[in-house]
Amino acid sequence: MPSARTVFRFFAGLLLAGHVVSAAAAELPAVFTRALKQAAIPLDHVAVVVQPLDADAPLISHHADAALNPASVMKLVTSFVALNQLGPNYVWKTDVWADGPIRDGVLEGDLVIKGHGDPGLTLERMWLLQRELRGRGIRHIHGNLVLDLSDFELPASDPGAFDGEPLALYNAAPGALVANFNATTLRLKPAGHAIEIEPEVALPGITIRSDIALTDDSACNGWKDALVPDIPDPGRKELVVAGHYPRGCGDQTLSLNLFEPAVTFDILFRGLWAETGGTLDGQTVPGMAPDTPPLVRFESPPLTNALTLLNKYSNNLMTRNLFLTLGAEAYGAPATLDKGARAVRADLTQRGISTRKLVLENGSGLSRIERISAGALNQLLRAAYRSPLFAEFEAALPIAATDGTLKRRFRGSPVAGKAHLKTGTLRDVSALAGYVDAADGRRVSVVMLVNHP
């Protein structure tokens, strides 16, 4: 039986071949309805809108007003509003203060860091931040590391609540200070009859124990699924990795969402600082930044960089931080989920995009309750096309069979290289929205949402 993904591929092929564009207005092509029937997907669980960008009315509009879960296609909404409200050159800032005198490379006092939600503070960029601190004369810190997280006000959350996978990176929580997408990366290496585990960056205060059984299998299939990482006692900060690992896999890396963002930031900051010869004597404590100009203001790459990463690679954490940033910029800090939702609704309403069926939780689509209609998504795609920022919006989308999440999808199909599409997948949800260059030369906006087991 064909899957929803197979149906999507088939539908995109129909678009490019012109079968959809030549269909009678508002009708689903018969070949497409047959494909849905073969996949056992009822028509009332599907919403489709197709409209040439130069046309005033859709060619196809099926259940366009139905409120359906869009999965990661919701990222288009957050991205569209971000370009409108923040602008393509918006940058996040991370501010650092030295709360004491600096003499002969020693800070006699606390180092205070205030995060404003930069979602792309990778290890490489954290190293650059630390290099700026060294440029200000700091190599040794005789004080605490003080983290100011006050720009974000978030409810307590369970990273495993969504699907029972708390260590999966896609479940990483947002935060005012986030390092390396909240990923702790481990290197796995067969050594004799065991597996050695080494962290990518030194992890001060973290114990790693390998209980992995090395097998003699030469094939390397599903090795990640065969591993069972666990933190038996979060208070001890001990990571135990059990399971089995085929010798044929050789060296591999495993990235995990082990701790809440502030803890991961602390661990990685200390690890990088120590690796480059620095020392930090004190504890890590929460606190408030002083009301004075920072010693270092470290800026992120522009918003367009973040939009490319979060759309092409469907990065949930980046999108959730962006959603919160929208709220803070519109209504003032601290950022909250409610402010983010209000900011998104206000922008869409201002641009004539329907919000009647819109339900927002975190703006990323990693949600069981988020909803939007295919008609509203089509309105958004058309509004983006008319915007002076369309080039930035479209460039952030995966290209069929070319890059991002679509690099291995639509290969060998007529749509390969001729569509910019955002897809989304959850349990019982498949979704697709974007732009296709049809066979007759017209550009077409297309939305397809399927909510069915």
Language model region names:
Residues 17-21:
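N-terminal signal peptide c-region/cleavage motif recognized by signal peptidases
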Residues 48-50, 94-96, 433:
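Short beta-strand scaffold segments in enzyme catalytic cores
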Residues 5-13:
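Sec-dependent signal peptide recognition
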Residues 56, 75-82, 145, 177, ...:
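Residue-level preference for non-acidic, small/hydrophobic
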Residues 61-81:
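Short active-site loop at a secondary-structure junction
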Residues 59-61, 323-453:
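Small-residue-rich helix-loop
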Residues 23-54, 60-67, 132-136:
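Beta-lactamase-like hydrolase cores
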Residues 28-36, 85-355:
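Conserved serine DD-peptidase/penicillin-binding transpeptidase domain
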